[in-house]
């Protein structure tokens, strides 16, 4: 018997071009409409730093007797400072996946899967991880994770104290720019946002003479600053515990200089770019598609 996937699309802010979060009310509604769901998978924080109400969503999901799995790939740092939102691992999620390499001092491709409750079938997880993982693990990567955890155990408090101090100082400075706006969670309208990861630096170009792609290019070509991503209406930078005071200073100076050069424009004249993807109609499940008769076109 094939099991189908049911997708819940996030709230959207069309003005800023940013996707928001998933509300507990929408989760409740979807689970009531789809009684055969066996697990609920949610991304929080998102790439842009949007955090959903994990605690309430966990309560909703558990009322339906299924586990909550949280993709917290961009939130491995949350546990280390009260400056950031609370990790899903502490809010009732049953399984939490974190990528060390995204926001902690660890090599690329290092990640962990936390089993946080008895609702997770440990033996089944081990079996499938054994199927999908390589039979030739990298001891360099595993040593990198050990070194990361050892470093955080010894110096983590001081490292994150300095990091959050420099980050907040930079955010305060960047918030004073007149045209390029540093986005806060409260600025994203109708978003279903419960909290916001302030290590994500979102620079809105709405109402300016540049778009996100051009701002990204200027930062790279003129200032040699490589941002994380460019979208139509904003640029994303991800700050992490390894960032230095000098690095924040360079970014602030660059944004301030660009802000002074560009022009303010009428928002109504901007192209109506939509964040939402087309709502596709599901004709078959992934498993059905894999097993279906196929035809090759040259």
Where do the PLM segments sit?
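Conserved PLP-enzyme active-site core in the AAT-like
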Residues: 3-187
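Non-catalytic terminal extensions of PLP-dependent enzymes
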Residues: 172-298
């Amino acid at each position: 018997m094939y099991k189908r996937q049911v997708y819940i699309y996030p709230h959207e802010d069309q003005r800023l071009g940013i996707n928001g979060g998933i509300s507990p009310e929408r989760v409740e509604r979807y689970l009531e409409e789809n009684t055969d769901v066996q697990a609920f998978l949610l991304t929080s924080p998102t790439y842009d730093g949007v955090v959903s109400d994990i605690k309430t969503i966990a309560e909703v999901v558990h009322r339906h007797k299924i586990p909550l799995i949280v993709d917290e790939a961009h939130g491995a740092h949350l546990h280390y400072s009260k400056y950031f939102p609370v990790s899903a691992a502490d809010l009732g999620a049953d399984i939490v996946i974190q990528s060390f390499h995204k926001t902690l001092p660890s090599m690329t491709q290092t990640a962990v899967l936390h089993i946080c409750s008895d609702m997770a079938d440990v033996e089944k997880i081990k079996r499938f991880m054994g199927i999908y993982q390589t039979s030739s693990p990298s001891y360099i990567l595993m040593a990198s994770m050990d070194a990361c955890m050892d470093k955080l155990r010894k110096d983590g408090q001081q490292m994150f104290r300095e990091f959050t101090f420099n980050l907040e100082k930079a955010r305060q400075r960047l918030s004073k720019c007149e045209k390029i706006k540093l986005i806060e969670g409260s600025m994203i309208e109708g978003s279903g946002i419960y909290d916001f990861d302030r290590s994500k630096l979102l620079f809105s170009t709405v109402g300016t003479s540049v778009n996100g792609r051009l701002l990204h290019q200027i930062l790279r070509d003129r200032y040699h600053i490589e941002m994380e991503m460019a979208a139509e209406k904003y640029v994303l930078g991800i700050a992490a515990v390894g960032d230095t005071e000098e690095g924040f200073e360079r970014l602030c100076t660059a944004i301030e200089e660009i802000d002074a050069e560009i022009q303010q424009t009428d928002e109504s004249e901007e192209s109506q770019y939509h964040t939402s993807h087309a709502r596709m109609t599901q004709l078959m499940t992934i498993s059905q598609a894999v097993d279906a008769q196929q035809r090759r076109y040259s």
